A protein has these predicted regions:
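Glycan-processing catalytic domains of CAZymes
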Residues: 1-257
Length: 257
């Protein structure tokens, strides 16, 4: 090959272009300019035919823990969960009511009363550091509060409880950040639980069969949820992109006993 041919022939390879459903023309233009040999999606939707016809490799995002609300709604007991601790509440004379969801978006989480709260919840006297016996407190579903009928006056108390993640935290983050409107909240589901595990394996096989144009699956969120907590006004309250604390349940905890 002479020098002129070497310098004039278009070079391709080792460049992957992210794309989305509403930027197809721009994607094609950048592919040509940069000599990209692969395309990856940003939102997990099907690729437009125009992009499939480019001959480039297709990298498709695949979500194992969401994007099937029909399944999640049919099996609410296998929705992902996390532990939440309330703020500190000071007892006065008489009963103390501790609201569980204060400071937490009701769109994001829902209190789990399906599993035995006496076993999986904990009320702690923070002034002494000692847990309160289950028979000394009760949960009032109507008010959403844990009630201590006879607390120690001027002692501080907290409640730790399980909550379902009824809106995938990352999906909520994307929606809030980008100002999305008129869309369905994606519900999480726990792929480690028996029914969802079997469903997930079949769902993956079906996706592969039905998307033969995809060269590489880009798995995102294998089984855990990032710990992203929003308040009632959808403001970020706690953000941890590295932790796994939003991936717990009585079923999983039982595996460690």
């Amino acid at each position: 090959m002479d020098d002129q041919t070497r310098h004039t022939r278009p070079l391709t390879g080792r460049v992957t272009i992210p794309t989305d459903m509403d930027v197809v023309p721009q994607t094609l233009e950048i592919m040509k300019r940069w000599g990209a040999d692969a395309i990856r999606d940003c939102d997990g939707t099907d690729f437009p035919q125009q992009l499939r016809d480019t001959g480039a490799k297709v990298y498709a995002t695949y979500y194992t823990t969401r994007k099937d609300n029909a399944w999640a709604k049919a099996h609410p007991e296998e929705v992902q969960q996390c532990y939440i601790m309330t703020g500190f509440y000071t007892a006065q004379e008489g009963p103390l009511a501790i609201p569980l969801m204060k400071g937490i978006s009701p769109e994001l989480m829902q209190v789990n009363t399906r599993d035995d709260i006496r076993r999986w919840w904990e009320v702690v006297d923070r002034s002494t550091g000692k847990p309160i016996p289950p028979e000394a407190w009760r949960y009032d579903a109507e008010s959403g509060c844990v009630i201590l009928d006879a607390p120690e006056a001027y002692h501080e108390y907290t409640v730790s409880f399980l909550a379902y993640l009824i809106w995938d935290p990352v999906h909520m983050y994307d929606a809030v950040t980008n100002g999305w409107k008129d869309f369905e909240h994606q519900i999480t589901f726990d792929v480690r639980q028996p029914k969802t595990h079997a469903f997930t394996m079949e769902r993956l096989r079906r996706f592969i069969r039905e998307h033969d144009y995809v060269d590489v699956l880009r798995f995102t969120t294998f089984f855990h949820q990032f710990t992203l907590v929003f308040d009632e006004h959808c403001r970020e309250k706690y953000v941890d992109w590295y932790g796994y604390s939003a991936s717990v349940s009585p079923y999983i905890l039982g595996q460690f006993e």
